[in-house]
A protein has these predicted regions:
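Cross-family detector of peptidyl-prolyl cis-trans isomerase
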Residues: 1-151
Length: 151
């Protein structure tokens, strides 16, 4: 009788271990798939996630790029959108015309690519925010940016 009891306990432990191993394996596969999509610049804290792959040439410093974007605060509040205005936004990449997080986050994008940029305050609007505007001091910003054109 004791042998059957111990055998039952061992069987339950083995089944639970196999279940947990299989679940962990699925999570590892999912993380491996996402690894190519999400990156973080260690020195700046910028996080990027590719939402849609692009094609063609990559945007480089000195290029004039045209994008559509929507900006959010961490709580999900939308504060700006070129899509809502129906007018794309163009700027010279890497020249400081935009916040540093944009210069870093848009660099390397391909035409047609859509990225999520998570920009810490240090490379966003910092401790000043946008006085009288929608971005509070020390805000982490989230942008969805689609690269439309490189000139």
């Amino acid at each position: 009788m004791k042998a059957i009891f111990y055998f039952g306990i061992i069987l339950i432990v083995v089944v639970l271990a196999l279940h947990l191993f299989a679940k962990g394996s699925d999570q590892n596969k999912q993380l491996a798939n996402n690894k190519n999509q999400i990156s973080m610049e260690n020195n700046s804290g910028l996080q990027t996630e590719i939402l849609k792959e692009g094609t063609g040439e990559k945007a480089e410093a000195g290029d004039t790029v045209t994008v559509h974007y929507t900006g959010y605060l961490e709580d999900g509040t939308k504060f700006d959108s070129s899509l809502d205005r129906g007018e794309p936004f163009s700027f010279n990449l890497g020249t400081g015309q935009v916040i540093e997080g944009w210069d870093r986050g848009v660099a390397g994008m391909k035409v047609g690519e859509k990225r999520k940029l998570i920009i810490p305050p240090e490379i966003g609007y910092g401790a000043r925010g946008t006085p009288g505007g929608p971005i509070p001091p020390n805000a982490t910003l989230i942008f969805e940016v689609e690269l439309l054109k490189i000139d």
